[in-house]
A protein has these predicted regions:
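Conserved SAM-binding loop
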Residues: 35, 78, 122
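NAD(P)-dependent Rossmann-like dehydrogenase/reductase catalytic/cofactor-binding core
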Residues: 2-8, 29-31, 179-188, 213-321
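Hydrophobic/aromatic residues located in beta-strands of well-ordered beta-sheets
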Residues: 33, 92, 120-121, 142
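Structural/interface elements that position substrates and couple domains in central-metabolism enzymes
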Residues: 34, 183, 196, 200-206
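Rossmann-fold dinucleotide-binding core
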Residues: 121-189, 193, 197
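Rossmann-like NAD(P)-binding element
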Residues: 41, 56-119
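NAD(P)+-binding Rossmann beta1-loop-alpha1 motif at the extreme N-terminus of oxidoreductases
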Residues: 1-56, 60, 113
Length: 321
């Protein structure tokens, strides 16, 4: 299987926040990165933000890779000519907003410049690649590589091949993600919402129903995750939890399957629509702790703690390796 070499060029299509994170991740791995945007001023803004963010991460001790912040920033350049950006690239990560029509337009523009040794991934969080590449001549070089926000501190990447994606393209994408320190999972085929959002939406569905039924306050619902499931799931997943909570997963099923089934029969059938009246009621509770005009401050708080958790997990892994 061919791999993306360390001296390869990587192109990011879209200069928004996710595109900037991808650029920093690849630069941290020592790759030369080119960011494409049709607006030069957006490119300049992105490059300035990347430089400042890398410098801040370095001062906070959470910079990834062996290169300094200035060395990593020097690896990232910008260009507003698509053909020039794609020329010589081994890997392309599209990061435009979540719109089928927009993604179709962008991929149609890229198609003439895609080569047979190039991997072209979309950062789509729910839209399958087959929904917008079906008419492309290079659709077999495309797939989903969905990051989790913020991807610099949450390493999971969902790799979802389309029905035409060549196996080597999928394998090459996964190898690259591992090389730059991400944690890829590969789905065998397309499914709506991929893996993470199918699990996440299942959780939100039940949280929404419990709140509407008056079972718990918004604060207590979040506490169930932050002080209950969350700490455990930060280190072991639900299947390993089953395995450890009995004498193996088979023993867990023998002991608890009927009880779990009985609980599940009380669930309201999905899907549900997250309705505005319920959201407005939730907001009255949530904004007491986090006013809407303080959301950005809370995001910064979140990222700082995710960075600390990432460092902790990395240190623990190094001790056990």
């Amino acid at each position: 299987m061919a791999t993306v070499q360390a001296d390869s060029k990587i192109t990011i299509v879209g200069s928004g926040l996710i595109g900037q994170f991808w650029a920093m991740i690849f630069a941290g791995g020592g790759f030369k990165v080119t960011i494409f945007d049709i607006y030069p001023e957006q490119i300049s803004k992105a490059l300035e933000n990347i430089k400042a963010t890398l410098s801040r991460y370095e001062s906070q001790g959470c910079l990834r890779g062996s290169l300094s912040a200035s060395e990593q920033a020097a690896l990232v350049t910008g260009c507003n000519e698509l053909k020039k950006c794609l020329d010589g690239a081994s890997y392309v990560q599209e990061c435009v907003p979540e719109s089928v029509d927009l993604k179709r337009k962008v991929f149609e523009q890229m198609d003439p410049f895609i080569t047979e040794d190039m991997v072209v991934a979309t950062s789509s969080s729910c839209i399958c690649v087959s929904q917008f590449v079906g008419n492309l001549s290079h659709k077999h070089r495309t797939l989903v590589a969905h990051p989790v926000n913020p991807p610099y501190f949450i390493p999971l990447v969902e790799i979802v091949p389309g029905p035409w994606t060549l196996p080597d393209v999928t394998a090459k994408c996964r190898a690259l993600m591992e090389l730059v320190g991400q944690s890829p999972v590969t789905l065998s085929r397309e499914v709506a919402g991929f893996a993470l959002n199918r699990i996440q939406y299942s959780i939100i569905n039940e949280c929404w129903n419990m709140y509407k039924d008056g079972l718990l306050s918004a604060e207590d619902i979040d506490k169930v995750m932050t002080d209950g499931l969350g700490p455990r799931y930060a280190f072991i997943g639900p299947l390993e939890t089953m395995h450890l909570n009995a004498d193996g997963i088979v023993d867990y099923c023998n002991r608890y399957a009927q009880g779990a089934y009985n609980v599940c029969t009380t669930f309201k059938p999905p899907p549900i629509m997250y309705d505005v009246p319920t959201a407005e009621k939730m907001l009255q509770e949530i904004k007491k702790a986090i006013p809407v005009d303080k959301v950005q401050e809370r995001r910064t708080w979140r990222d700082e703690r995710l960075a600390a958790l990432a460092a902790l997990k990395r240190n623990l892994k190094e001790k056990t390796d």
